[in-house]
Amino acid sequence: MAKTYDYLFKLLLIGDSGVGKTCLLFRFSEDAFNTTFISTIGIDFKIRTIELDGKKIKLQIWDTAGQERFRTITTAYYRGAMGIMLVYDITNEKSFDNIKNWIRNIEEHASSDVERMILGNKCDMNDKRQVSKERGEKLAIDYGIKFLEASAKSSMNVEEAFFTLARDIMTKLNRKMNDSNSSGAGGPVKITENRSKKTSFFRCLLL
């Protein structure tokens, strides 16, 4: 049976329990939002195929449990991940502080060249905000990681986040292919950014 996609990207959602990883996954994969909190047991995944620059990309997105007792299970899935989204809750300061610990886990268990993004979820709850957007941006700059605020509930920036991570993986793959074929003729077609800006992040505001 012929493949229906050009690339398969394995993505990982990590972060403390309750920050909204599962809600982000459901919003992106099924455009749905569940108001009932159900803690992920171990690990789960969803699949969505997107199109970038004329290529069909199958995203296999793994949703990991944030509880400490599942840490040994979830770290096994770091291997082979091409992109990792570190999620915190803007209304929960501790979940933001723990992002540094999650980054340490990535450095210990994931590939050294994995693409990463820090995502501040629940920005629709601005009245309960404990973590400013500026603090999120600064942390991302300190680690050289992209940053975005999003809301699984309102869907604000959810598509943007996953597409940006996928595009960064695609760009890296393309660069590697070009490097490996630079000495020969008829190398792969260069995939270029359609947007003039590196990324076009939107501010999350309550209207």
From Swiss-Prot:
Per the record, its GO cellular-component terms are: endosome; endosome membrane; phagocytic vesicle; phagocytic vesicle membrane; plasma membrane; synaptic vesicle; trans-Golgi network transport vesicle
Q: Which cofactor does it need?
A: Mg(2+)
The protein's job, in short, is:
The small GTPases Rab are key regulators of intracellular membrane trafficking, from the formation of transport vesicles to their fusion with membranes. Rabs cycle between an inactive GDP-bound form and an active GTP-bound form that is able to recruit to membranes different sets of downstream effectors directly responsible for vesicle formation, movement, tethering and fusion. RAB8B may be involved in polarized vesicular trafficking and neurotransmitter release. May participate in cell junction dynamics in Sertoli cells.
PANTHER family linked: LD44762P
EC assignment: 3.6.5.2
| Phosphothreonine: residues carrying this PTM | 72
Official protein name in the record: Ras-related protein Rab-8B
Per the annotation, the residue ranges of the short sequence motif Switch 2 are: 63-80
Q: Which SMART domains match?
A: ARF (SM00177), RAB (SM00175), RAN (SM00176), RAS (SM00173), RHO (SM00174)
How activity is regulated? Regulated by guanine nucleotide exchange factors (GEFs) including RAB3IP/RABIN8 which promotes the exchange of bound GDP for free GTP. Regulated by GTPase activating proteins (GAPs) which increase the GTP hydrolysis activity. Inhibited by GDP dissociation inhibitors (GDIs).
List the source organism.
Bos taurus
